Amino acid sequence: MKILVIGSGGREHALAWKLSASPKVQQVYVAPGNGGTALSPNLKNVPITDLAALRDWALAEKIALTVVGPEQPLAAGVVDDFRAHGLRIFGPTQAAAQLESSKAFSKDFMKRHGIPTAAYETFSDPGAAHAYVDRLGAPIVVKADGLAAGKGVVVAATKEEAHAAIDDMLGGNTLGVAHNDGGARVVIEEFLQGEEASFIVLCDGKNVVAMASSQDHKRLKDGDEGPNTGGMGAYSPAPVVTPDVHARAMRDVILPTIRGMDKDGIPFTGFLYAGLMIDGDGKPKTLEFNTRMGDPETQPIMMRLKSDLVDVLMAATSGKLDEVELQWDRRVALGVVLAAGGYPLSPKKGDLISGLPKPTDEVVVFHAGTVAAGDQIKTSGGRVLCVTALADSVRQAQTKAYDAARTIHFDGMQYRRDIGHRAVKASH
């Protein structure tokens, strides 16, 4: 069978890599893909970004299954369109994707269905937003209501920072985020204390299967300093997600979400990613929902998945996830993102990448912001590569990933040296 993966990041490279390992697959296409997918012998890039043109191509090629990586095509309704033309596609409809594409929809949904989350208010009037911050004080969280590539969130340590973020998002709207009703809007919410975890599940509208737990590193610099990014590294499993926390997350967050969406007439199919904050008592609260796999969490999760992903997604697109039990490698996988100089604000592009190691069973370099120029690979964006390693312990996986990362070079390359530091600490 032929499979299409939509997207161009490290997450899509990892999904395509995993799908291409299935004996049922004749060819995996990635649209538009990147330098890594271009040069992989098992994958083929399709240089189409227009979704209607891609649908026509998929019909002509008789694509048996399409998997959507990023949020933008989901918010644009790619799933609705492919389905309307009889194509099998895994992902949420445009209406269901609002759990991610609209912060206000998401928070109102959680309030309505009793899903634990931070207290919040939504504002489009700067004056009222400033007054709310003055009343609540800091630390406080200010979020642009709409898709902002994971960067539309300011955790303000002081009231001044919060006021500046409001001016930025509502006054200047420098992120250029328009929410679904047009105009700028912010969600301001209480700051939650605890440890974060990425809890990702597969849904078929009614049934849910949990993926392995993982933990992302959002900040640019070591010790969780610097600006927020799309994610600088991740590992799986996350020790903070104990069996007890796992049970609570399913009971208090995931199942009420899937049931609530169904009840609201918007059944959810696809990957659902709950960003959780787990407090000292092991109680999870929902920071945000993403309606797709995380990036870079997908890379270590795919390294650990032993089940045939094609079988799993065919079941998920037939409403048969209740028949699926996922098999996982018991080892730890850890991925380190190598980012371009100037990331996240103004990443450099066009630099030659050298020293890429050949993939092995235990170390794979997934590509994101890369482009193939002949048989050379150049940088083309913010997060360039994700070096992912599998080993018996988090410390060994860390060593293996960093050893591989040190062989790679491109001008201005930057990466964190402490990915997995919480898990290493927890293992002592």
What is the role of each PLM region?
Residues P92-G152:
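A conserved helix-loop-beta module that forms one wall/lid of the active-site cleft
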Residues M1-Q94:
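ATP-binding N-terminal substructure of ATP-dependent carboxylate-amine bond-forming enzymes
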Residues D50, V371-G374, K378-H428:
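Generic C-terminus detector
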